[in-house]
Amino acid sequence: MREILHIQGGQCGNQIGAKFWEVICGEHCVDSTGRYSGTSSQQLELERINVYYNEAGGGRYVPRAVLMDLEPGTMESIRAGPFGGIFRPDNFVYGQSGAGNNWAKGHYTEGAELIDSVLDVVRKEAENCDCLQGFQVCHSLGGGTGSGMGTLLISKIREEYPDRMMLTFSVFPSPKVSDTVVEPYNATLSVHQLVENADECMVLDNEALYDICFRTLKLTNPSFGDLNHLISATMSGVTCCLRFPGQLNSDLRKLAVNLIPFPRLHFFMVGFAPLTSRGSQQYRALTVPELTQQMWDAKNMMCSADPRHGRYLTASAMFRGKMSTKEVDEQMINVQNKNSSYFVEWIPNNVKSSVCDIPPVGLPMASTFVGNSTSIQEMFRRVSEQFTAMFRRKAFLHWYTSEGMDEMEFTEAESNMNDLVAEYQQYQDATAEEYEEEEHDGEEEHA
């Protein structure tokens, strides 16, 4: 019932995805061979395990996951990794050539050749579902495969399953840490697609994750494994309500209804609490007020945009563990009252919370935060400036045009991204009075 089909693409997406499955397996007590190893008498972990797993013969649980890449490297390391044996072997779909950090290769040439084999696997998995709720895609926007082929897959799935939710976990290029020089091109072309074809995008970026590792977790030299662990904690938190019994449940669609006031503005900031360094865990008492306070803290956001520079249109919090819903509601109202200037006043009750009874492994309680803040425009604005600087000189364009792309497509993507920034700005500046006037104008026009 209510299954989610997980798709990971490119090196970044596959590494995040592999970590995510380790976390989910831990929560559902599934060992690395795919068998249930829990001891609890109620077996709560199994009650709705079919959201993410298929039950195969012999009591094995197989992830509903599709893994794709344009080169074999990452796939092979996942296969050799601790949970490599749990995936269905047919669900690894990969090419040999690589996309060379080129969006056009992922979207139009190399990726387009491989896409049909990926769609076959997606169809097979979707047919295995009782009532498919939607898809979750892990990818980065700076490279070639995750961004180019990832967005190609999203648009194809959109055509074939128009009424299913499409949730993405998208790793944006970081402001200071750059992997390749053409990141701004790849990211802008991807955002152009995500605005049109995705329903909900969780925006992540490495720099914010590094900052959390340095400042909060006190890690001296964090690895990608540490960063991916943070992301997977959040991914597990977003869907815990679907996988475990809870007092206030939410699913992908309810999340969307509560978070998206205007269809194009579906890029969210995410956060997770409690984040404590390994050494100081035993000195901290976890309480609902403390979770709430850390969760709303700007330092806790997993993307480099500061919520204090904008206003929240909407937000949603998912709490996990044994706690009183009344206390959760009081704390959330408290946050809104104390920081009312950071919330738009023309959407009353714009913060929702849900509570799930089962905490993550090793913690008594935890919470996940998803916010739709106008300050996310900082991310887009930054990428857009870098894009314009290069595009004005037509730098590196030949890599894209030689794969059959047209300059026009770049211009369209650029203006779509600039429109998005302008829309966020417009709603950031809007006040309740203006909003009412607009309503009246609208009514007069209809009359």
From Swiss-Prot:
Its cofactor is Mg(2+). Coiled coil: none annotated. GO terms for molecular function: GTP binding; GTPase activity; metal ion binding; structural constituent of cytoskeleton. GTP binds at residues 11, 71, 140, 144-146, 206, 228. One of its GO terms (cellular component) is microtubule. Residues 428-447 are annotated as: Disordered. SUPFAM superfamilies: Tubulin C-terminal domain-like, Tubulin nucleotide-binding domain-like. It is found in: Cytoplasm, Cytoskeleton. Mg(2+) binds at residue 71. PANTHER family: TUBULIN. Belongs to the tubulin family. Dimer of alpha and beta chains. A typical microtubule is a hollow water-filled tube with an outer diameter of 25 nm and an inner diameter of 15 nM. Alpha-beta heterodimers associate head-to-tail to form protofilaments running lengthwise along the microtubule wall with the beta-tubulin subunit facing the microtubule plus end conferring a structural polarity. Microtubules usually have 13 protofilaments but different protofilament numbers can be found in some organisms and specialized cells. Tubulin is the major constituent of microtubules, a cylinder consisting of laterally associated linear protofilaments composed of alpha- and beta-tubulin heterodimers. Microtubules grow by the addition of GTP-tubulin dimers to the microtubule end, where a stabilizing cap forms. Below the cap, tubulin dimers are in GDP-bound state, owing to GTPase activity of alpha-tubulin. This is Tubulin beta-4 chain. It comes from Zea mays. The lineage of its organism: Eukaryota, Viridiplantae, Streptophyta, Embryophyta, Tracheophyta.
